[in-house]
Amino acid sequence: MTEAMIRKKPGMASVKDMPLLQDGPPPGGFAPVRYARRISNTGPSAMAIFLTVSGAFAWGMYQVGQGNKIRRALKEEKYAARRAILPILQAEEDERFVSEWKKYLEYEADVMKDVPGWKVGENVYNSGRWMPPATGELRPDVW
């Protein structure tokens, strides 16, 4: 199909038949283009920025110091509470150990009753130095 049939107008025979429309500059020409670097002369000065940042940093460090004081006080309170109850816990552990040690000595006496010359509770290593007893055997609830 030709343009004449679609648009109901006669088509162009040549490009030369086209109307001459061309874009151009406006009358008087275009405004000059500014291509130089644009440095703003508004806004805070370098000194104002420096002082603001320094103040914010100083305030932040002050807050860190206050947090350290609070954390140190809480830690000291926790340690003081532990130091306060430590003698009670140690007394309970000593009492438990003595009762378990008595049971252990009774068991040892029962097991070794047929061995001549066996002394119940005597150290078998005879190193001459005092060593704390191996409490692993006396703590079946832990192991």
From Swiss-Prot:
Annotated organism of origin: Arabidopsis thaliana
Entry's family note: Belongs to the complex I NDUFA13 subunit family.
Question: Which Gene Ontology cellular-component terms appear in the entry?
Answer: endoplasmic reticulum; mitochondrial inner membrane; mitochondrial membrane; mitochondrion; respiratory chain complex I
Q: How does it assemble?
A: Complex I is composed of at least 49 different subunits.
- Answer yes or no on keyword Membrane: yes
Q: Where in the cell is it found?
A: Mitochondrion inner membrane
Q: What is this protein called?
A: NADH dehydrogenase [ubiquinone] 1 alpha subcomplex subunit 13-B
One Pfam family this sequence matches: GRIM-19
**Alphabetized UniProt keyword annotations:** Electron transport, Membrane, Mitochondrion, Mitochondrion inner membrane, Respiratory chain, Transmembrane, Transmembrane helix, Transport
